Design a protein with these regions (language model features):
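Acidic, metal/ion-coordinating pockets
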Residues: 20-394
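C-terminal/domain-terminus segments
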Residues: 9-11, 106
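C-terminal motif of bacterial Sec signal peptides marking the signal peptidase cleavage site
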Residues: 15-18
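Bacterial N-terminal signal peptides that target proteins for export
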Residues: 1-8
Length: 394
């Protein structure tokens, strides 16, 4: 997406001459050969970030991956995420919550102590995800060893990840995490409310929600050069469609400390999205309380699917400031296997014709519930009208 332009040597020379110091000595001179050109990077003035919710693996998903496996790929998740690839590729940076450790061995499992094969994460990467969030209530399901192995696997995949660390020293080294996206320096932070009562026993480091630490890391991220900051807390109450006072309080705290975009997870159902405008400064921030599940085998009301949110940030051409521009959402549902060769699969609204007829009722219920909630509570975050080119698989 980056564009380059070359400035003619004459123009460069004029600029240099115009900036010459009148106090320079007579034998000081600047010259450019006629064939010299100066390469200047030119970026678009916007960047699009796309966020999805909780990537889960329950027992039936694991069983299906084994059923469809081959000698070369014994745990097959290849088709699970491909229908959303057009949306991921259309964005400049794509983020997902990896709500499980990659435990290794053959002792994989679903709820309540998750552990998934490495191929699960690889399928997410192949679909187009760039950043994996690892700070959530299941990151210590396989204790310190599983947490560290997850990081080893993600590092071997050369994919970005934040939220958990091998030790405190590594956290100090890797935070702030700043990504340059279309020339804009974006800081990312990830925290969790807890880890289901499991504590690290061998020095592994989890980014827990701690206001003093959050404040410290926000300040460090700004100081390190971030022009805009995104925080992604794992918070709230499961299966509740509205945020609670604790979430609102933490969101206000983070915005007051300088966070521009907040994308929450954990409830396994969607919660409202709101653009918040500071009445004094006019600064606009985005709060998404929960995106719900990305993929799972949950069957409780409102857990079969979730929402994605596309966020556009921009560089102001007049001030050079990077800021939040707008956001829009879309919906999707998890298709469950319906015959030989089929797998659990995320089916977005623009591909809903590929959902088996017998599951259309689940889609209607989920989509209508999300639409009703968002129509009532969303503030300046409309449904997307963007159309993506259909994925190639059926």
């Amino acid at each position: 997406m980056k564009k380059f332009k070359f400035l003619a040597a004459l123009f460069a020379g004029i600029l240099l001459a115009g900036c010459s110091n009148s106090n320079a000595t007579d034998n000081t001179s600047l010259s450019l050969n006629d064939s010299t050109a100066v390469a200047v990077k030119e970026y678009p003035d916007t960047a699009t970030l796309i966020f999805f919710g909780d990537a889960m693996q329950h027992k039936m998903q694991l069983t299906r991956a084994i059923t469809l496996g081959t000698k070369e790929n014994p745990y097959n998740y290849d088709d699970c995420f491909t229908l959303v690839t057009p949306a991921l590729k259309d964005a400049d940076y794509s983020i997902v919550n990896l709500e499980l450790p990659l435990g290794g061995g053959k002792d994989y499992s679903g709820y309540p102590m998750f552990s998934a094969p490495d191929s699960y994460a690889k399928a997410l990467q192949d679909a187009g995800f760039d950043l994996f969030l690892t700070s959530n209530n299941h990151c210590l399901d396989r204790k310190d060893k599983g947490l560290r192995r997850t990081l080893d696997v993600l590092d071997s995949m050369k994919v970005d990840h934040i939220g958990t660390y091998r030790n405190l020293e590594e956290r100090t080294k890797l935070v702030p995490f700043i990504k340059e996206i279309n020339g804009m320096k974006v800081g990312f932070l990830n925290y969790t409310y807890g880890t289901n009562g499991i504590k690290a026993t061998n020095g592994a480091e989890v980014a827990y929600i701690d206001r003093n630490k959050i404040k410290e890391e926000i300040e460090a991220t700004r100081k390190a050069g971030a022009e805009i900051i995104v925080a992604m807390p794992h918070w709230g109450v499961e299966y509740v469609l509205n945020e609670n006072e604790s979430q609102r309080s933490l969101a206000n705290f983070m915005m007051n400390e300088g966070v521009d975009i907040i994308i929450g997870g954990h409830p396994h159902v969607v919660q409202p999205m709101k653009v918040v405008t500071d009445p004094i400064t006019g600064r606009r921030s985005l709060v998404v309380y929960s995106l719900g599940n990305f993929i799972s085998n949950m069957t409780k009301a409102n857990t079969r699917g979730g929402a994605l949110v596309r966020v556009v940030i921009e560089r102001d051409p007049n001030t050079g400031e990077v800021k939040f521009r707008n956001a829009e959402y879309d919906t999707f549902i998890t298709e469950v296997p319906s015959g030989p060769g089929t797998n659990f699969r995320v089916v977005p609204s623009w591909e809903i014709d590929k959902l088996p007829a017998a599951q259309k009722g689940n889609w209607t219920q989920h989509n209508n519930a999300v639409q009703k909630l968002y129509d009532k509570y969303n503030v300046d975050v409309p449904r997307s009208t963007k159309k993506y080119q259909a994925a190639s698989n059926n």
